[in-house]
Amino acid sequence: MSWKLTKKLKETHLASAIGLNSGGSSFTRGLKNSTLSSTSSRKSSDEKSRKSSEDKRSPQSTVVQPGLLQVTIIEARNLKLPSGHVPANYGVSIDNSLLAPPLSNGSGHARSRSHAWWLPYIVVEFDKNEILVDALNTASLENPCWDYQATFDVSRYSKLSLNIYLRSSSSRSRNGMGNDAFLGGIKLSPSFIVNKLTDEWVPLHGGSGELRVQMLYKPNQSTPLTIDAFELLKVVGKGSFGKVMQVRKRDTSRIYALKTMKKAHIVSRSEVDHTLAERTVLAQVNNPFIVPLKFSFQSPGKLYLVLAFVNGGELFHHLQREGCFDTYRAKFYIAELLVALECLHEFNVIYRDLKPENILLDYTGHIALCDFGLCKLNMAKTDRTNTFCGTPEYLAPELLLGHGYTKVVDWWTLGVLLYEMITGLPPFYDENINEMYRKILQDPLRFPDNIDEKAKDLLSGLLTRAPEKRLGSGGAQEIKNHPFFDDIDWKKLCAKKIQPPFKPSVESAIDTSNFDSEFTSEIPMDSVVADSHLSETVQQRFANWSYQRPTTIDTSDDINTIAPGSVIR
């Protein structure tokens, strides 16, 4: 779900929907230009395929009830400044409204904080829920102190990440990238033993020094959620069905994205199945590069989805501003997206709507795939579907031809997206939709002169028109094995141990500067829905919407089994 709730082609039966021979309609994308062909270099190896199968073994698991994870970031010691980094000037001010609010010190009293903007800050992330905490004005650059306590809602298992940064003398560059230096980070696997306090010094990876962290898990009263559990902060997106608001959960102070949808509008547009599919996918999937569902609930007139608030901006926003990305940056995003799509395919889900508007960046620059309204569920490897949906410039040839399509359709759109990142436009883009469809089906794939040879070969494989010959038709591992990804350590990538090539300028969890002011300037409110006279039968279709599930604890870290409470380095 792009926060804009962008409009896409509604799913209909393909035979009556394409109309390639009818009068062309004009379609404007915004900023970009390019075209497509086949051939693939498939570096498949029996050893890698076998290893991939072993990596997907069912992990050990334990069940834990929803609860609260209390994290206290105390201090760090022996940090070192990267060579060549110019730190921010002592005493430079920052808008206090952007800083994390004072939290309880454990006894119920608010802690007064004097922030030092020029000292290292820490980004704490649990299940894609991120907070930024500035150091106290009582410490040094090498030995900063935060003495900060945060409480996270636990709705499923997730690792806890803590990354330390230091602002530079120019914190925000002209391209919107944060120039802040990475000083090191850790990743912890929390213990979910009730009321057991862990307190340890943990060595940083990617830097020098250690960080002291305390964790305590407490069960939570599982009372039904309502809109009253949230403080409405900002509107960050709108659509025909409703809107998306930035909210603060009152009991934990965590920031979320609350998507509200009017039942009557969903029913009148025959979108019930799509809406239920989105919630189903979000509830099932646990992947570091997919926006997680925290809760869902409903009222007689509305449906509500509570998701992690990812505020680094849409990839579309960054791509539009910069025109295109360098090859490494594009590779990094495509690699993380590949892992996300592979996860969906293992759940027998086809995504079908991959595009820059549906990809968000988090605080640190990792991607988060969102908007699952066009997903197709229960699609085994060889299953085919014939429905027509997606966004025009990303549609695969087999979809346009009405031949039916499989999961392999997602690899075509991955290729289109990579091409767009590198060149600035989708390969067959045209303002006339019907002419664009013709190009997708008939035109050769052409490349600008400056494209990397390995990237060309990968794109030729992904953009092969015959789906059975397309790179990835044998599974995601085929794509991972391509020479374009030779310098990617997939295990480190999945563990988010590779520093992103770009870090958005984000000041805090409530910063909305990467969102359209058209939305953020609007007063947030949960509008009253007039009596829609929905029948009991219609209401029954939403009977299982509300979601606050027990969590299955996955004690595996990619390949290796990690005991709960251990440090992941």
Swiss-Prot record:
Q: Which residues bind ATP?
A: 236-244, 259
UniProt keyword annotations, A-Z: ATP-binding, Kinase, Nucleotide-binding, Phosphoprotein, Serine/threonine-protein kinase, Transferase
Domain C2, chain residue ranges per copy: 45-202
Residues covered by the Protein kinase domain: 230-485
Q: Supply the PROSITE patterns for this chain.
A: AGC_KINASE_CTER (PS51285), C2 (PS50004), PROTEIN_KINASE_ATP (PS00107), PROTEIN_KINASE_DOM (PS50011), PROTEIN_KINASE_ST (PS00108)
The family database entries (Gene3D superfamilies) matched by this protein are listed as: C2 domain (2.60.40.150), Phosphorylase Kinase, domain 1 (3.30.200.20), Transferase(Phosphotransferase) domain 1 (1.10.510.10)
Any GO MF annotation of the entry: protein serine/threonine kinase activity
Q: Does the keyword DNA-binding apply?
A: no
Q: What class of enzyme is it?
A: transferase
Where in this chain does the record put each AGC-kinase C-terminal domain? 486-557
Query: Mind telling me which Pfam families this protein's record contains?
Result: Pkinase, Pkinase_C
- Stretches for region Disordered: 19-63
GO CC entries: chromatin; cytoplasm; nucleus
Q: Where is the composition biased (Low complexity)?
A: 31-42
Output the SUPFAM superfamilies linked to this UniProt entry: C2 domain (Calcium/lipid-binding domain, CaLB) (SSF49562), Protein kinase-like (PK-like) (SSF56112)
Enumerate the catalysed reactions. Answer: L-seryl-[protein] + ATP = O-phospho-L-seryl-[protein] + ADP + H(+); L-threonyl-[protein] + ATP = O-phospho-L-threonyl-[protein] + ADP + H(+)
A GO biological process of this protein is:
positive regulation of conjugation with cellular fusion
Q: Which residues form the active site?
A: 353 (proton acceptor)
Which sequence positions carry the modification called Phosphothreonine?
387
> In UniProt terms, what function does this protein have?
Involved in a signaling module for sexual development and cell growth under stressed conditions. Required for G1 arrest under nitrogen starvation and for growth at high temperature and osmolarity.
- Entry's PANTHER family? RIBOSOMAL PROTEIN S6 KINASE (PTHR24351)
Which family does the record claim for this protein?
Answer: Belongs to the protein kinase superfamily. AGC Ser/Thr protein kinase family.
The protein's name in its UniProt record: Serine/threonine-protein kinase gad8
Q: What is the phylogenetic placement of the source species in the record?
A: Eukaryota, Fungi, Dikarya, Ascomycota, Taphrinomycotina
| Gene designation | gad8
